[in-house]
Structures are given as structure tokens and as C-alpha cells.
From Swiss-Prot:
Placement of covalent cross-link Glycyl lysine isopeptide (Lys-Gly) (interchain with G-Cter in SUMO2): K36, K187
Gene3D superfamilies named among the record's database cross-references: 3.30.70.330
Modified positions (Phosphotyrosine) in chain numbering: Y98
UniProt keywords, alphabetically: Acetylation, Differentiation, Erythrocyte maturation, Isopeptide bond, mRNA processing, mRNA splicing, Phosphoprotein, Repeat, Repressor, RNA-binding, Ubl conjugation
UniProt-listed GO biological process terms: erythrocyte maturation; mRNA processing; negative regulation of mRNA splicing, via spliceosome; negative regulation of RNA splicing; regulation of cell differentiation; regulation of RNA splicing; RNA splicing
Protein name in the entry: Polypyrimidine tract-binding protein 3
PROSITE patterns: RRM
Length: 523
């Protein structure tokens, strides 16, 4: 479309009123003016900017001026869109796009040339919204999106370097519609979730926009498919599952309940009824800093510009205002087996997920302990991965403690060695900035990754070592390209956890100490 076509944009029914270019800020209108759009952008991409906020009813592209006009079905939808994009600059094809209200109250493009593509794109979107057509890129397991597609998404998070809580998922996905229920779990050594929308169309938009995107810079990649389930059955509201329509549900066995402020936020009138909580007038539960970061090229803004500070890159995540990541680094660990557990054992186990500074087993209740991590994010990671795992015949429970630090016993105070300070331990896995250990954080599994193996140690030596520790070895293999590393598969996850506690840092001779961690692979 050449520049002369801008003369054909009319407003308020006055065919003599022509658009003259940029105007000062004006009152809300359902017609939005977009500036600095890429010259090669498609009509569908521009329309996608408005999809999360409501129906797009008209579009006019002024490619020669790198501008466009987008008409929403209602002024309310346009206001929601402007409110969202004011602090979060949208991007098209990696280029920032600027949006403001137009002086026009509606777009009249009937008699304009070169509008066929825009109208075709609008008709396609309208068909999707009415359930009669599939969106490009939104497919089911069979490869096509059928009418009546499930409102439930299956989400897998790869490269889980930093904690992704249920609240973080709610914050991200609620940009595309009302999230009714979320269930999180670990399967095939991967953190996964099932998320149910109120409307299948919202699930389609979310999948289009978020599949393949990173939650944080260069990590926590979202892989999204439609679930075969059409509804989720949530029995408990806790840190692993949530029914946002039933805040009266119990928390379940030993699970932390929803904090009152969080429950009030998710259950407040107007939030569940609004599909875009956080976009207009609602301060989201997780307030990510509005700074340079990630963008979504198609339907933007869901992830927001999440930014990790330099401390986060070294494994100490700092997201100012992120109430979804509590600021406490001390965990309360309960339901331990007092006959077997020691401060050193807890240090080794929790040290898989962060640097443990102090451990205190309760003097009068030895099945309980406090574990102080280096920071809140490491505490969250450890809690997410270890709570619910079996250890020495009992199901370990980990929650955030009310204590801000583990106090060392006073001089002369009876302690029986139940409190230990590990803050200067050489066994910390994450003390080096940029350590590869940040890339190898996986849930407990029956397969262990072994490293730092000296050349003289054979497969039989290692199998015997684990057998003598009470494990049943199911399989073993050295890495083909690096014989210093191996995988060993044991009889159960519980066996593997106990073997890791006992054999990590085991002296193999020749100044080599065995390094043990959980593997994402199987043999």
C-alpha cells in the first residue's frame, strides 16, 4: 500500500476528515495507532498483537510509513491492550513497536485498495474465534486443530536452571485467558504441568505465542502441546496443584497452604472474571521488572521482559518484586527418619540443588530439620525437587521455614552435633559463577551421573561400590567420549537418593573423589 492510501482513512463518519500522522496523546478509542512496524511484517502478525485482549474487527496497514491501525471490538479491549503495552513494549520480528490511541473512533476501509489480505486475515481469525478453523501452528497430537479442541495444555519445561513455580505459570498463561486449574508434576525427569483454560481458544493463543519461548533468559524453555484431557480434577490447593475456582480445597498431606494474601489475590472478584489479570488495574502476584528482556514475536507480552541479574547468572536469581519466589532461604524439612539422617546427609542431598550453608536437626524432634541455602531461589529449587521424595523409608516434606537463618548453638549449649555450619565447605557445587552444574539440575531419578572417575577404576569396581552400599545395580555404562564419566541405574529413586548421600565425594584413590548427581538420561 502506498502512502497516498492514508487519505482514505476516515473517522466518526466524516468522510472529509483525513489522518495527518502522529497526534498528541488522545482519549481512549477502540482504534489503535501502531508505529515503527517492520516493513516485511504480515497482517496476521499485526493482528496477533491484539488477540489476547479481545476480538480484532479491522486493520489498515500503511507499510510505506511503517504504521498500522488496529480496530478492536470494544473500547474496553483497547484500553486493556494499551495498559498492558505501556510498560511492556511489544516486538514484531525483534523490532519494538509503539502503540497509542488513535483520534479515529472506527476504521472505514471498505473502499480502500489493497485491503484483501487484511480482510482475509481478519476472516481467518474470526473463524478461529468461532471454532470453525484452525490457527497456523496450533496443532493437536494428530497434527490438526479440530473444532472443540481441549482447553487443557500440557507444558514441559526444559533447561530448568531456575525455579518455575505454579504462580509463575499462572502469571505467564493468564495473559491469554482465564486459567482455571494447574497441576504440576515431574515425569521422565522433567518438570511438567497441565493447565486448563476457561475457553479452548485461549489455549490455542497461548500455545501459538509461548511454545518454544524461554521464561528466563536462555533457560526454562516452554514446550507446549494440547492435552487429551478436556478437564482437570484438582483435589488439593498447594504448591503443586491449584483450582482457582475452589479456594476452599484442602492443602493435602503436609503441603503448604496458599498464603492469605495470595489466596485473596487469586480469588478476588474481578480477577477470575477478567481473562487478562495483570493487564488492567491488577498488580500481578509476580511483578517482574519492566526492563529489557524477552519478547514474544507473535502474541506478545505473556512472558514479559523477564530479566536475570548478574547474580542470577551465577545461580543466585534476583527478580525484584517477584513475590512468587519467596525471600526465605531456610527450609523446614519434616518426616525424616531419625535413625539414619544426619546433618551431613542433608547437606549432601540438598547440595544437589544449591549451596547449603547450615543444617540443624531439631534436638527434641529429630524427624525435623532446618536447612539454610545460599539464597531463596536455591531453597525454592531444592523444595520443588525434593519434597515428596522417599528417603530411608519415609516421604520427605520440605516447606519454607518461618526462620530467616539457622542459629548456631551457643558455646556450652548441648547440641549432640545436630547443628553444622557448611558455609565454607569445598563441596559446594555452585560457588563458581557460570559453573556447568547450573545446567545439570535434574529431579531425583533412579539413574545417577558419575564423574571424576580415575582411569584405573573399572566398571566392576564401581558396581561393587554401589552394591556394598546396599544398592541393586540394574545397568551401568561409561560415556563413550569421556571415560571419566558414567551412568549407573539403581533399583529405585529412593536407592539412588541414598546412594548419592553415601557415595558423593567418595575417595576413589589417585586424588580422585567421586562426583554423584541425578541424571536426566536412562540407560
Amino acid at each position: 500500500m502506498n502512502n497516498s492510501t492514508s487519505a482514505g482513512v476516515y473517522a466518526n463518519g466524516n468522510d472529509n476528515k483525513k489522518f495527518k500522522g502522529d497526534r498528541p496523546p488522545c482519549s481512549p478509542s477502540r482504534v489503535l495507532h501502531l508505529r515503527k512496524i517492520p516493513c516485511d511484517v504480515t497482517e496476521a502478525e499485526v493482528i496477533s498483537l491484539g488477540l489476547p485482549f479481545g476480538k480484532v474487527t479491522n486493520l489498515l496497514m500503511l507499510k510505506g510509513k511503517s504504521q498500522a491501525f488496529l480496530e478492536m471490538a470494544s473500547e474496553e479491549a483497547a484500553v486493556t491492550m494499551i495498559n498492558y503495552y505501556t510498560p511492556v513494549t511489544p516486538h514484531l520480528r525483534s523490532q519494538p513497536v509503539y502503540i497509542q490511541y488513535s483520534n479515529h473512533r472506527e476504521l472505514k476501509t471498505d473502499n480502500l485498495p489493497n485491503q484483501a489480505r487484511a480482510q482475509a486475515a481478519l476472516q481467518a481469525v474470526s473463524a478461529v474465534q468461532s471454532g470453525n478453523l484452525s490457527l497456523p501452528g496450533a496443532t493437536s497430537n494428530e497434527g490438526t486443530l479440530l473444532p472443540g479442541q481441549s482447553p487443557v495444555l500440557r507444558i514441559i519445561i526444559e533447561n530448568l536452571f531456575y525455579p518455575v513455580t505454579l504462580e509463575v505459570l499462572h502469571q505467564i498463561f493468564s495473559k491469554f485467558g482465564t486459567v482455571l486449574k494447574i497441576i504440576t508434576f515431574t515425569k521422565n525427569n522433567q518438570f511438567q504441568a497441565l493447565l486448563q483454560y476457561a475457553d479452548p481458544v485461549n489455549a490455542q493463543y497461548a500455545k501459538m505465542a509461548l511454545d518454544g519461548q524461554n521464561i528466563y533468559n536462555a533457560c526454562c524453555t516452554l514446550r507446549i502441546d494440547f492435552s487429551k484431557l478436556t478437564s482437570l480434577n484438582v483435589k488439593y490447593n498447594n504448591d503443586k496443584s491449584r483450582d482457582f475456582t475452589r479456594l476452599d480445597l484442602p492443602t493435602g498431606d503436609g503441603q503448604p497452604s496458599l498464603e492469605p494474601p495470595m489466596a485473596a489475590a487469586f480469588g478476588a472478584p474481578g480477577i477470575m472474571s477478567s481473562p487478562y489479570a495483570g493487564a488492567a488495574g491488577f498488580a500481578p502476584a509476580i511483578a517482574f521488572p519492566q526492563a529489557a528482556g524477552l519478547s514474544v514475536s507473535a502474541v506478545p507480552g505473556a512472558l514479559g521482559p523477564l530479566t536475570l541479574t548478574s547474580s542470577a547468572v551465577s545461580g543466585r536469581m534476583a527478580i525484584p518484586g517477584a513475590s512468587g519466589i519467596p525471600g526465605n532461604s531456610v527450609l523446614l524439612v519434616t518426616n525424616l527418619n531419625p535413625d539414619f539422617i544426619t546433618p551431613h546427609g542433608l547437606f549432601i542431598l540438598f547440595g544437589v540443588y544449591g549451596d547449603v550453608h547450615r543444617v540443624k536437626i531439631m534436638f527434641n524432634k529429630k524427624e525435623n530439620a532446618l536447612v539454610q541455602m545460599a539464597d531463596a531461589s536455591q531453597a525454592q529449587i531444592a523444595m520443588n525437587h525434593l519434597s515428596g521424595q522417599r528417603l530411608y523409608g519415609k516421604v520427605l516434606r520440605a516447606t519454607l521455614s518461618k526462620h530467616q537463618a539457622v542459629q548456631l548453638p551457643r558455646e556450652g549449649q548441648e547440641d549432640q552435633g545436630l547443628t553444622k555450619d557448611f558455609s565454607n565447605s569445598p563441596l559446594h557445587r555452585f560457588k563458581k559463577p557460570g559453573s556447568k552444574n547450573f545446567q545439570n539440575i535434574f529431579p531425583p531419578s533412579a539413574t545417577l551421573h558419575l564423574s571424576n572417575i580415575p582411569p584405573s577404576v573399572t566398571m566392576d569396581d564401581l558396581k561393587n561400590l554401589f552394591t556394598e552400599a546396599g544398592c541393586s545395580v540394574k545397568a551401568f555404562k561409561f560415556f563413550q567420549k569421556d571415560r571419566k564419566m558414567a551412568l549407573i541405574q539403581l533399583g529405585s529413586v529412593e536407592e539412588a537418593i541414598q546412594a548419592l548421600i553415601e557415595l558423593h565425594n567418595h575417595d576413589l584413590g589417585e586424588n580422585h573423589h567421586l562426583r554423584v548427581s541425578f541424571s536426566k538420561s536412562t540407560i
